[in-house]
Amino acid sequence: MRWDDFEAACPRIAGIARERFGQDEVVMLGTVRTDGAPRLSPCEVDVAAGRLLFGMMWQSRKAQDLLRDPRLVVHSVPQTRMNPGGDVKLRGIAIEERDPDVRATYREAIRARIDWAPDEPGFHLFSLDVREAIYLRFGEEPVAWRWDDAGGCRELRHPDAAT
C-alpha cells in the first residue's frame, strides 16, 4: 500500500510514524543480504509525492539488497534507552522509483530539509509498499497498535499488560 493510502487506512500509526521520521530524519532499514543474513543500515527518509521515500548512494549495499530482494523493515530510531516516543515498525516491499517527477519531488523535499540534494542520476530511490505497521510504547502508558491489510488498524494486548 502506498504511503498516502496507508495514512488514510491507519492515521493513528501513520501520524506517529510521519512525526517521528520527520523529527529523527533517519530510520534503521533492514534488508536481506545475498547470503540471506539481515543487514541493518541507517537511512534518511522523506515523505513526498504520496510516498515514503528512501534515497541511497549509487550501488550501495543496501540498494543492491533491495534491487535483488525487495523485502524490507523500517524501524524508528530509539530516542533514549526508555524511548518514551515508542517504536514504529513498518514491513513491506521496496519499489524502485524511476519516474522523473517522483525523483524531482524527492530532490525538492530533501533540499528543503538539508539544503542539499543528490544529483541525477547518481542515486537510488525507493518507496515503501506498506504491508504491516506496528507501534509500541512502553512505560506508564503502554500502547500496542497494529495495521495490516487483512485486519486493518487495531489495538493489541500490550506485552507489558498485567495478566
Per-region residue spans from a language model:
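Charged, gly/pro-rich active-site loop segments
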Residues: 1-12, 84-163
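Short, conserved active-site entrance elements at the starts or edges of catalytic domains
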Residues: 3-34
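Short beta-strand segments
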Residues: 24-58, 64-66, 72-78, 86-89
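A generic "binding-loop/recognition-motif" signal
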Residues: 58-59, 131
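Short, surface-exposed beta-strand-loop junctions and turns on beta-sheet-rich folds
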Residues: 60-62, 81, 142-144
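Short secondary-structure boundary segments
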Residues: 78-79, 130
